[in-house]
Curated annotation (Swiss-Prot):
Domain of life: Bacteria
Organism of this sequence: Pasteurella multocida (strain Pm70)
Lineage: Bacteria, Pseudomonadati, Pseudomonadota, Gammaproteobacteria, Pasteurellales
Protein name: Uncharacterized protein PM0314
Length: 196
């Protein structure tokens, strides 16, 4: 019994539970924008997205262009639904670069192995949706998404024409994931997908 206790004491720091997250740093899901502003993680002003980014304006986003991250800054987008924080998106800076391998390693160390990896060809999706007719010569837009902590933490990596773009880390409230799942499973959407 003593051996088990000693081994578990040594091995416990290396066991990473695969549980959901409740936010990021001092930002907790369920906070109001006023509470989020009080955290002082933004060294600039929180502001609404630009007018030309209508999807984010409509969906209740607030943006910080100088959000403390590591030894520098990232762009943070907070999504509020019903006045409560439900999603935190961190866009990595271009300089210093955060390579995909490093981010994957650190996230796996903190949240455990990836639970899902999704790879999408965004150009092919646009062609299928009728947004564009055909792919330009040598054009590619590949999006890889890695999920951790029961899907509440995601790492998205976009490669456009062979050039890696700054990564994004997204922290989502579990209830937001359930809502998105319900929307995906709507009978109308399933019927439409089957008929197309």
């Amino acid at each position: 019994m003593k051996i088990f206790a000693v081994l578990s004491a040594f091995l416990m720091p290396f066991v990473v539970p695969n549980t959901t997250v409740n936010g990021y740093k001092d930002l907790r899901f369920g906070m109001t924008i006023e509470q989020a502003k009080e955290t002082k993680l933004c060294e600039d002003q929180w502001h609404l997205p630009a007018d030309d980014d209508w999807r984010r304006v409509v969906r209740g986003y607030w943006v910080c262009d100088k959000f403390r991250f590591d030894d520098g800054y990232a762009v943070a987008r907070l999504r509020f639904i019903g006045g409560q924080l439900k999603s935190i998106e961190l866009k990595m800076p271009e300089y210093p670069k955060y390579p995909a391998e490093l981010l994957l390693h650190v996230l796996e160390e903190k949240y455990g192995k990836t639970i899902e990896v999704e790879q999408r060809d965004l150009i092919e999706e646009d062609i299928l949706q009728g947004k564009i007719r055909k792919r330009r010569k040598n054009e590619s837009a590949l999006l890889d998404t890695y999920q951790f902590a029961k899907g509440t933490v995601s790492l998205t990596l976009l490669t456009y024409n062979g050039i890696p773009q700054p990564a994004e880390i997204i922290y989502s409230a579990p209830e937001l994931l359930l809502l998105e799942k319900k929307l995906e499973d709507r009978p109308q959407r399933r019927t439409l997908l089957r008929d197309l």
